[in-house]
Amino acid sequence: MGKIRKLDDQLSNLIAAGEVVERPASVVKELVENSIDANSTSIEIHLEEAGLSKIRIIDNGDGIAEEDCIVAFERHATSKIKDENDLFRIRTLGFRGEALPSIASVSELELITSTGDAPGTHLIIKGGDIIKQEKTASRKGTDITVQNLFFNTPARLKYMKTIHTELGNITDIVYRIAMSHPEVSLKLFHNEKKLLHTSGNGDVRQVLASIYSIQVAKKLVPIEAESLDFTIKGYVTLPEVTRASRNYMSTIVNGRYVRNFVLMKAIQQGYHTLLPVGRYPIGFLSIEMDPMLVDVNVHPAKLEVRFSKEQELLKLIEETLQAAFKKIQLIPDAGVTTKKKEKDESVQEQFKFEHAKPKEPSMPEIILPTGMDEKQEEPLAVKQPAQLWQPPKQEWQPPQSLVREEQSWQPSTKSIIEEPIREEKSWDSNDEDFELEELEEEVQEIKEIEMNGNDLPPLYPIGQMHGTYIFAQNDKGLYMIDQHAAQERINYEYFRDKVGRVAQEVQELLVPYRIDLSLTEFLRVEEQLEELKKVGLFLEQFGHQSFIVRSHPTWFPKGQETEIIDEMMEQVVKLKKVDIKKLREEAAIMMSCKASIKANQYLTNDQIFALLEELRTTTNPYTCPHGRPILVHHSTYELEKMFKRVM
């Protein structure tokens, strides 16, 4: 007797369930996507014990005909594709015909559905076996309940996380679906407690406000672009609103949420030097394209896709974001604490709001004005640095009570800010006063961010603090400028242009530089020797696993030649290519940082004025090359609020 045998359907479904149904979040995703494909406009999701005990999905979609109910739970049975041509023109979220049989094989499932034209169907399935089928009275739509998930595969239960974690995975998926389909009203309940409710009015800003808070929604920049192959729409936050994880970026392709690293990377590249290292924006990007240009049949979970014209798409995303930011003044507001109802702000935003303004005001730190009066439009030139206040030798220290108060906040600060998307709640669902209509009104009242160019307005210096921060003013209020970051931006753009224009000339090293590598690294570098020659770096083999460098391109910054060479080697080993543009940019950043004014360096008023005027000539006067903010703004209104001049 042969050893190879065909597996029965039940065992096949159990195996398939291992890929399709990884955890309760997978069940919710598949069932909600089925509801959307069935043209539902309202979907309710009810959970018990994070879905491990019970998941119930109720929709008002097309429903399932009686004759299709049994067939729907057979493997690879679907109404969404018919032939090979349909597979490459998929517009629906589901198409594989694996979800329902996979879910039914590892749970106790109950289905009540009706098309509205005939009596409904009531179906009970346990572990893949049909227990009961009968006609029943039912409204149009589908009501499907999944209980005791993985009851017959206890090994899978061992890999489930805590209820808190599993619930977080579900809310994360539901949030993405809500962003993907703002035209569908979604309600999410856990143990009868409402966690999310979207109106289904098609306004994605309202969905984003429900998820991230109304304060974040006020900082959203609309993104829109179109090419022959792609249409892009979405929102991204201003550079001042960032998170420590990429998890806050959502990419949607033809209505389907996908996890695609290169798309997220393109969004980051669109910000370029506007973001600090290790910080990421909150973003939502919806991409529409011909289904022929995207392959969604990569993985059973359908979260991964491949693009036919990937480079064109990435370039469009980067250029669209960069163009949008060039139309905006990116000066972050410092903000002033005001009494607002907690329902208006998330915990995260309350913390940011309270701690964004300076915490240690001290009278001696204020530098005297430099001769400006109300009638003058230009500041008086004061050349004598003696007029600037000099700090005492002993630096002022805040009272110990303030220090203790700050320290007591630190542990909770990290836990609040660093949490992933699913932990961020924008409003308390039990607050009866906060209704969906109020959120709609607040979103409608949000003013569009002004797209009136990103030129820095004229700033008139009024002093310097700690030899580090410059104070300036204009008719819009007070500005605080980090002098090192400001000159770093000026120098960066100068060196970037200078390095970018340098011809491929080489310069001899006085002492050859030796590079020792592992065998794998050596082989990868050896493959790229010709590419390295094209950018002006000539390597000679020296021994078994080493190279020596006798010359380098003339644009290498003096004193950092070996650092740039090591960076090039690291690029070759990791990326298997040489990105000369990135190398030159890093060289420009390195040179600009070393050549800039340092902290605790006192400047004359003329030097300050010249620095601010030079900053205005840069293409991006708002962040240094590392993404840190250069200046912060206090509006006149905020200052009046501080001093209770307005209430």
From Swiss-Prot:
InterPro entries with a match to the protein in the record: DNA_mismatch_repair_CS, DNA_mismatch_repair_MutL, DNA_mismatch_S5_2-like, HATPase_C_sf, MutL/Mlh/PMS, MutL/Mlh/Pms-like, MutL_C, MutL_C_dimsub
Q: What keywords appear on the UniProt entry?
A: DNA damage, DNA repair
One Gene Ontology biological process: mismatch repair
* Highest rank taxon of the organism: Bacteria
Q: Which PROSITE patterns match?
A: DNA_MISMATCH_REPAIR_1
Which CDD domains does the annotation name? HATPase_MutL-MLH-PMS-like, MutL_Trans
Output the Gene Ontology terms for molecular function.
ATP binding; ATP hydrolysis activity; ATP-dependent DNA damage sensor activity; mismatched DNA binding
List GO terms (cellular component aspect).
mismatch repair complex
Q: What does this protein do?
A: This protein is involved in the repair of mismatches in DNA. It is required for dam-dependent methyl-directed DNA mismatch repair. May act as a 'molecular matchmaker', a protein that promotes the formation of a stable complex between two or more DNA-binding proteins in an ATP-dependent manner without itself being part of a final effector complex.
Name the family the entry cites. Answer: Belongs to the DNA mismatch repair MutL/HexB family.
Q: Which PANTHER family match?
A: DNA MISMATCH REPAIR PROTEIN MLH, PMS, MUTL, DNA MISMATCH REPAIR PROTEIN MLH1
The protein in question is named: DNA mismatch repair protein MutL
Its gene is mutL
